Amino acid sequence: TTTIKAKKALSVGNELIKKIADNTHSLESNILKNTTIAISCGDAIRGIENPILKTNFKDLFTSLNRNLEIAGSINNKKFIIEAKKTAYNNTLLYDLGEIKDAKFDFYEPLLANSIKLGYANQDYDDLNGRDEFNNTSEFKAPITRVNKLYDLTAPYRADMFGVEFTRINLQGKTTTDNNSDNDVFMLDVEYDFTDADGIENYKLRRPAFTSITGLIDPPSAFNIDLSPKRIFNKHGAWIRGMMWPLTTEKITFQTTDKNPLLKTVQGGVTIQENADVVISDLEPNYFIPITAKFETIVPENLVDIMQSNSTGLFQFTHNGDTYKGWVIACSQKPSTDVEQQWTLLLSADNNINKLIHA
């Protein structure tokens, strides 16, 4: 058994925010407080004394978003990170009334016909490394309107063989002569005990799956809950929104660098890394990838409305039908009553059958 130093994701984030803001802001996050993800580095895994975790907030946020699907906001000198679904609040903020002329169109920045997710592929000097499942996986979507990649890869690693090879092959060496020394690793952990010095100790999480196949040594495996297919599922609501209205179609698995065969069953739920995905099996989508553009007079208290709930919905009526959406863009000239341009992203509960004409 090897003990390595690691930090909680919330602790790393808070340190980075304070450094960026010169101690004027802090990080608040229930999702990071409760996550099982800890952050370590190559030097810590090797057992180097006083290891330094070299990272930045962009890499931290991008990596945590990959695994947790998060969104960030600022409020009263606090940077807040929570689940992305909280940014798609269905609370109605304001009814803009009847709109004379509205233009509806697909919002292409939210469309993609291929999906890449997971972790940078690694080269190992060991044949067993081919069993690694936390690599980059690629999927093909049925969309033909665009030729674009949706990228859910990020810098932090979670490959168990990378952790093990770093620990076993280099443990106790005092020089920083390995490619993984400065790499940042995610570890899926659970609380174990608090020692006499008051330091919390954690152990690697190894969930009790009903069945697990596709690995050489399943009992020793870890970081399974950080796998690419689980990343896919975590972003399921967003991906389903991107694919609208192709709910009966499939997103097909294409390739991965090493092991595509990992399959687990737990609580009646099967997760297979190389399985295709029926879009309708994903979580309900937050949005429809359609924008409504129109001009109307902006309410005088628009700023107050937006500050009260920056993630709420605006509503309008067009040709007798009511629509709701989140603000992508709007402008305000308080000194005039001139109509201003609005752009809303439609929420998933809109009925837009009348708009589908091609």
Model-derived segments and spans:
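Polar, S/T/G-rich
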Residues: 1-41, 51-62, 117, 127
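Acidic, small/polar-enriched beta strand-loop surface segments
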Residues: 3-10, 92-259
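Short beta-strand-centered interaction patches in the first periplasmic/extracellular domains
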Residues: 33-112, 116
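Secondary-structure transition/turn motif
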Residues: 81-89, 345-354
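Autoprocessing Asn-cyclization modules and mimics
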Residues: 265-305
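Short coil-to-beta transition motif at edge beta-strands of beta-rich domains
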Residues: 297-319
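Short beta-strand-centered aromatic/proline hotspots
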Residues: 320-337
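Short, solvent-exposed secondary-structure boundary/capping segments
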Residues: 333-349
